[in-house]
Swiss-Prot record:
Domain Peptidase S74: 1243-1340
UniProt xrefs under PROSITE patterns: ICA
Chief location of this protein within or outside the cell: virion
Coiled-coil ranges (or none): none
Protein modification: Proteolytic cleavage and release of the chaperone in the host cytosol stabilizes the folded protein.
Keywords, comma-separated and alphabetical: Host-virus interaction, Viral attachment to host cell, Viral tail fiber protein, Viral tail protein, Virion, Virus entry into host cell
Protein name, per record: Long tail fiber protein Gp37
Organism of derivation: Enterobacteria phage T2
Signal sequence residues: none
Subcellular location: Virion
Length: 1341
């Protein structure tokens, strides 16, 4: 171990000298002052060199002043930090400099070798820069071997720019913007996103790899028209033609004032003739005609329809002479193979050929029934609200597989044929409501009501038994013929009856009267004739005639012919009806029949039908279950054929086809003027073929216009759309060439080089199956032409003529001035007066001094033709005084000018680049020719140009003078003080505002004002004020001397915390406004809602005692009169250890013992109200339920049971959405049965007056019929129950006071009957019977 003496250094001044081991003890130090080295001896006796030059480890920091030079490798374990203002500089000809071919093996000043990397997913950055919240880096992704510029922010959002090994450059997720020039490439430009440019000049745009949902092109212009300028709101999209001098087609999008937005196509040099338009509501217009499926081998010669049969405006379908043809306004024809087959007019559908309605899937080869409950022909007769069924007339209606016909309407059905009408089989049923009358061919007439003959009854024919009244089989007694009494002149006062009866079959009493013929009236019989039982030994009883009065006769009674009636009337020899024949009470009103088939004229609901019967059911069979050949709507006159497969609606001039349609070969459909085919496509209507791209080749996925090509003749061209221009003897078509499967637009002009004449043109624009497009000639895009030689002309810039652009070069060379300051002749240019431009770029400067950066400058010269007077504008753009400083020009002859520049001495070794417009030329004086001499003086007549200094910081600052500085990029100040703004320069009274960022906070600070004593205060430090600060860690803003907001208010997006004092609104007009917040769901709980409530009072761990905690309120004091009060919102606990708190709304006065009202809201929805609830006006609400009735209603218990006001004075009761009762001013309505223990009707005599007896009560009762019937809730509705009762119309005839008119649930007028009135009628009838019984009893006794 070294002693204290040994710790002292042993010294040596000899270079290279090292102490011997014997000279030093262990740990003793020796120093060589010449070599600056230190030595010691270790415990093994070895001399150790402790200096840095010998290597070793340094565990502390090293601070070095001066240069650092190292010959070997520099291995860096930790980071290397370049302090502010420092940099890493590499001298010229650094490692790796040389040819391209050696760069794979050569290293570089910064070199990373990733050749041994095994993790292919790694990204290896080599340069990285972090700023604010994001980091940029330059590195390599091993899996790609690509060089990437990468950006990632503190949230992990990542973007990158990739330089690929194939020479490509990829931008991830952003755009590639070129603001000062263009992107020029001899190869392809592949863009996965959008390319946005004022103009794109190219050969092909290929979008094969675009993602689903992306557009090929986008032209969403941002035009804004001031004033009324929108009348010219047009976006010009495309202009094309097929050849020079050919038709020019324009495609435009327009949004003009007063018009619908549309896209349209025009012809002409300008927008002269409109061909087609597609409006934003889906409507499409064609100028003339439309041909569909007419393309044949002669292409557009005849494929656009034939004007001979079709006229000028038509829709041709399938062939040139078939389709829809416009005749005149409101009139068009259906044309088939040159012939009109039907005319559609505003008031009719006229068949000009045979009309046949039926259902067939093979064009009439086989006929089938229409669908169940469907008709072949339906007429919309429900327009007159006839309430019969659906109100329509149906012909050929499939009812249960049988063909029926329904004729409906409030009018009448007239049949006016000279030979009358035959119903076969002979069944005719007339139905009205619950009544019906049925007529059978066997003579039977069956009727619910008695048959009434308004104009008498005449029986003709040979049968002697004209009228036969059969004895009832289900009841005692016989039938009576009755003449009712009347009150007019010539009418019988009492009813008169004729009846036949007898008592032979009575159970007891007199049974001798076998046959009695009796004539009587309401006061007794007039006479009767009777045959009594034969006397013993005789078989025929005698005839007795009794007249209850006199018998007067002046002639004879003659009866001829036979009338037989049971339940029908048979007319064997024809029936002649001179007046109107009415059929009512039955749906099947008329039958024409033979033994095999019958046809029935049927009215069903609101339709009239002509329906056949099934085979072999002609006379009495029902309508066919499915066939409905003809239907006429009784309400709208629409005619439906084939179970509405074809419907003609004359009211709306609309023909509806509800089945597949076929136009047979050589026929056509022609569209007339202004007609079109509209393929509907809306959110609810899905057109044929709509779906995915991958489904389009499915033969079952069709389209509004569809052709399925299934041919083997591969040389055939199959067009699907064709247009022929007759005057131009040319045709355009759209179709497929089978041999290639390519879809093409084809143009043919002239004939076939044979019988039709010479061929003039035959061109095809091919959309090929490999995705390519082939044009037969050049492609013109507005003024730009892509020629067949690959050249692009007519564009702007480089694409005015691409070949010329590629042939033109930018010339580069060297230029040198002398050591003398002065003017030099720089160039000679020729610029035509018709406008030309010459540009120069000069790199370099004057002098060669190290770190004189302004000597490495750039100057640019722009020369451009000027007129009036003749000359050129010469502008020199420089960046320092050590470049070209001034410029002058001299016109030497015509359009030739000499150019002079003024520069400093030693302005040499410059690089000059120059170019010119196509019509100009340039010669640089002394280019690559050695040092140029200074000129003695500028020539007389020269013109000094403009010199513009470009703003730069080559001298350390941006010396902009008094110019404004405008930047679109970031303004970065790498200093804590970023900006100082003085109020008045360095003058007295001026002060400054300073923007400062000390890393912890950002401040806006203020200095003191300049004074006479302190004249530089505005340039000094800030004073003690801290008016504004932003905490850089949490973003909080500090206002340390108050905040005055004089306009605009204070908008707070986050929270506003007031830690002390009150927040006061200035006056009564001040208010707190909370702007819109995001919506919250009802499922959000209180913890979620805490962050969503606009005005939030967080009471924290609130006690559940019965203490009251106000949240928000208002205080008012009504002047000197007192009335101090508060209006508050708060809550109160329930007073228990656990439980929900209740919400409180309270209004409180200034009296300690009262003047208080509290409304309490609990968690179960209960409202505890201290007083009554007044609802002056409210909508629907529910009691213990939601409200499903809507309108003005209250529901109870469930959402569709309650009370609803359905109109003025109308209050309805609903049960499960069904209306069961109505209260109104007048009658009360019950739509269901009323069950009650008893019903009491007010009948107090004190309420009654003007008493009158019910006369002839028994006769009135005998005119009534008790019937069993099915009853509906409203007229036209389905029967809902079976009842027994009487018919109101019949009761009205005998006792009008018992019948009252009211409305059903649909508002239809209906008749109701009074049970009380019926009881009164029956009481009087019983009294009459009782009197007669007593009379008979007295006679018998």
């Amino acid at each position: 171990m070294a002693t204290l003496k040994q710790i002292q250094f042993k010294r040596s001044k000899t270079a290279g000298a090292r102490p011997a081991a014997s000279v030093l003890a262990e740990g003793e130090l020796a120093i060589n002052l010449k070599d600056r080295t230190i030595f010691t001896k270790d415990d093994s006796g070895n001399i150790i060199d402790l200096s840095i030059s010998a290597g070793g480890n340094i565990s502390g920091n090293i601070t070095q002043t001066g240069d650092y030079t190292q010959t070997g490798k520099f291995n860096l374990i930790g980071p290397q930090i370049v302090a502010s203002g420092g940099y890493i500089e590499f001298n010229y000809r650094t490692t790796g400099s040389g040819a391209w071919s050696g760069q794979h093996t050569a290293k570089a000043p910064i070199f990373v070798d990733l050749s041994s990397a095994t993790s292919t997913s790694e990204y290896n950055p080599i340069i990285k820069q972090r700023f604010k919240d994001g980091t940029f880096s330059l590195g390599t992704l091993v899996s790609e071997g690509s060089l990437k510029i990468h950006y990632i922010n503190e949230s992990g959002d990542s973007k990158y720019w990739t330089f690929r090994r194939d020479g490509g450059f990829t931008v991830d997720g952003g755009g590639l913007g070129v603001s000062g020039g263009s992107i020029t490439t001899s190869g392809n430009i592949a863009a996965l996103g959008n390319i946005t440019s004022p103009q794109i000049n190219t050969k092909n745009i290929i979008l094969d790899t675009k993602a689903f949902g992306q557009y090929d092109s986008q032209s969403l212009v941002q035009y804004v028209y001031p004033g009324t300028g929108e009348e010219n709101g047009i976006n010009y999209l495309r202009k094309v033609r097929a050849k020079s001098g050919g038709t020019i087609y324009h495609e435009i999008a327009s949004a003009q004032t007063g018009k619908n937005d549309e896209i349209s196509w025009w012809t002409g040099n300008t927008l002269t003739t409109k061909l087609m338009g597609l409006r934003n509501d889906g409507a499409m217009v064609l100028r003339r005609s439309l041909a569909i499926g007419t393309i044949t081998a002669d292409e557009n010669t005849n494929n656009y329809g034939s004007p001979t049969p079709m006229g000028e405006r038509y829709i041709a379908l399938g062939d040139a002479a078939t389709g829809l043809k416009y005749i005149k306004q409101g009139v068009y024809d259906l044309v088939g193979n040159w012939n009109s087959v039907a005319s559609i007019t505003p008031d009719s559908f006229r068949s000009t050929r045979k009309a046949l309605f039926g259902r067939s899937e093979d064009q009439g080869g086989t006929w089938t029934m229409p669908g169940t409950n469907a008709a072949l022909l339906s007429v919309q007769t429900q327009a007159d609200v006839n309430n019969a069924g659906d109100g329509q007339t149906h012909i050929g209606y499939n009812s249960g597989g049988k063909m029926s016909h329904y004729f409906r309407g409030k009018g009448q059905t007239n049949i006016n044929t000279q030979k009358g009408m035959e119903v076969n089989p002979g069944i005719l049923k007339l139905v009205t409501d619950s009544n019906n009358v049925q007529f059978y061919a066997n003579g039977t007439v069956s009727s619910i009501q008695r048959i009434k003959f308004d104009n008498g009854l005449v029986l003709t024919g040979a049968r002697p038994d004209g009228i036969q009244l059969d004895a009832p089989t289900a009841a005692d007694g016989t039938k009576t013929i009755l003449w009712a009494g009347g009150t007019r002149a010539g009418q019988n006062k009492s009813y008169v009856s004729i009846k036949a009866w007898g008592n032979s079959f009575n159970a007891s009493g007199d049974r001798a009267r076998e046959t009695v013929f009796e004539v009587g009236d309401g006061q007794g019989f007039h006479f009767y004739s009777q045959r009594v039982a034969p006397a013993p030994g005789s078989t025929v009883g005698p005839i007795q005639l009794r007249v209850n009065g006199g018998l007067l006769t002046a002639g004879s009674i003659v009866a001829s012919g036979s009338i037989t009636t049971e339940s029908s009337l048979n007319v064997n020899n024809g029936l002649s009806v001179n007046g109107q024949a009415k059929f009512g009470g039955t749906a099947n009103a008329l039958r024409i029949w033979n033994a095999e088939y019958g046809v029935i004229f049927r009215r069903s609901e609101s339709n009239f039908y002509i329906i056949p019967t099934n085979q072999n059911e002609g006379e009495s069979g029902d309508i066919h279950s499915s066939l409905r050949p003809v239907r006429i709507g009784l309400n709208d006159g629409a005619v439906g054929l084939g179970r509405d497969s074809f419907i003609v609606d004359q009211n709306n001039a609309l023909t509806t086809i509800n089945s597949n349609s076929r136009i047979n070969a050589n026929f056509r459909m022609q569209l007339g003027q202004s007609t079109y085919i509209d393929a509907e496509c809306t959110d609810t209507v899905r057109p044929a073929g709509a779906g995915s791209f991958v489904s389009q080749n499915n033969e079952n996925v069709r389209a509004p216009f569809y052709m399925n090509i299934n041919r083997t003749d591969t040389s055939t061209y199959v067009p699907i759309l064709k247009q022929r221009y007759v005057q131009g003897n040319s045709c355009y078509s759209l179709g497929t060439l089978i041999s290639t499967g390519d879809f093409r637009i084809h143009y043919h002009e002239g004939g076939d080089n044979g019988s039709t004449g010479p061929q003039k043109a035959d061109l095809a624009w091919q959309f090929r199956r490999d995705g390519s497009f082939r044009s037969p000639n050049k492609i013109e895009i507005n003024a730009v032409t892509i020629g067949t030689d690959g050249n692009i002309t007519g564009g702007t810039g480089n694409f005015a003529n691409l070949n010329t652009t590629l042939n033109r070069k930018t010339t580069v060379g060297g230029w040198a001035g002398s050591s003398v300051v002065g003017w030099y002749k720089f160039a000679t240019v020729t610029i035509p007066q018709s406008t030309g431009t010459v540009t120069f770029k000069i790199s370099g400067g004057a002098g060669f001094n190290f770190k004189s950066y302004n000597q490495a400058s750039i100057a640019e010269i722009v020369l451009r033709t000027g007129n009036n007077p003749k000359g050129i504008n010469a502008v020199l753009w420089n960046r320092s005084d050590l470049s070209f400083n001034q410029i002058a020009t001299m016109n030497t002859s015509d359009d030739t000018y000499d150019v002079y520049v003024f520069c400093e001495g030693y302005t040499n070794a410059l690089i000059v680049e120059y170019s010119c417009s196509e019509n100009s030329s340039v010669t640089v004086v002394g280019l690559n020719g050695g040092i140029q001499p200074v000129v003695d003086a500028l020539p007389e007549g020269h013109v000094v140009g403009k010199t513009v200094r470009l703003l730069n910081n080559i001298g350390g600052t941006f010396a902009a003078g008094e110019s404004d500085i405008v930047t679109r990029g970031e303004y970065v100040a790498d200093n804590q003080k970023g900006m100082r703004i003085k109020s008045n320069g360095n003058n007295i009274g001026s002060n400054a505002a300073i923007l400062r960022n000390d890393g912890g906070s950002f401040y806006i600070l203020a200095t003191d004002k300049n004074t006479a004593e302190k004249s530089d205060a505005a340039n000094g430090d800030w004073n003690g004020l801290r008016p504004f600060a932003i905490n850089m860690a949490d973003g909080r803003v500090g206002m340390n001397h108050g905040l005055n907001i004089t306009g605009g208010g204070l908008n707070v997006t986050g929270g506003l915390n007031v830690t002390s004092g009150n927040t006061s609104l200035g006056n009564i007009s001040s208010r707190v406004v909370a702007r819109w917040r995001g919506a919250s769901g009802w499922a959000d709980n209180s913890d979620t809602m805490k962050s969503k409530i606009t005005f939030m009072a967080d009471h924290g761990d609130l006690s559940n005692s019965d203490s009251y905690y106000p949240i928000v309120g208002a205080y008012s004091n009504y002047g000197s009169a007192g009335y101090r009060q508060t209006f508050e919102f708060g809550w109160v606990g329930s007073g228990t250890t656990a439980g929900w708190r209740d919400g409180i709304i309270r209004i409180r006065g200034d009296n300690a013992n009262g003047q208080q009202a509290r409304w309490r809201f609990t968690m179960d929805g209960t409202l505890d109200c201290p007083g009554k609830v007044l609802l002056p006006q409210t909508g629907a609400f529910g009691v213990n339920t939601s409200n499903g009735l809507g309108g003005n209603s209250i529901t109870f218990g469930d959402s569709d049971t309650g009370i609803k006001q359905n109109g003025d004075g109308l209050l309805d009761i609903y049960a499960n959405s069904v209306q069961v009762f109505r209260f109104q001013n007048g009658d009360l309505y019950s739509y269901k049965n009323i069950n009650a223990p008893n019903v009491y009707i007010r009948s107090d005599i004190r309420l009654k007056s003007n008493f009158k007896p019910i006369e002839n009560a028994l006769d009135k009762v005998e005119k009534l019929n008790g019937v069993i019937y099915d009853k509906a809730e409203y007229i036209g509705g389905e029967a809902i129950e079976t009842e027994a009762g009487i018919v109101a119309q019949t009761l009205q005839d005998v006792l009008p006071e018992a019948v009252r008119e009211t409305e059903d649930s649909k508002g239809n007028k209906i008749l109701t009957v009074s049970s009380q009135a019926q009881i009164a009628l029956l009481v009087e009838a019983v009294k009459t019977l009782s009197a007669r019984v007593k009379e008979l009893e007295s006679k018998l006794m």
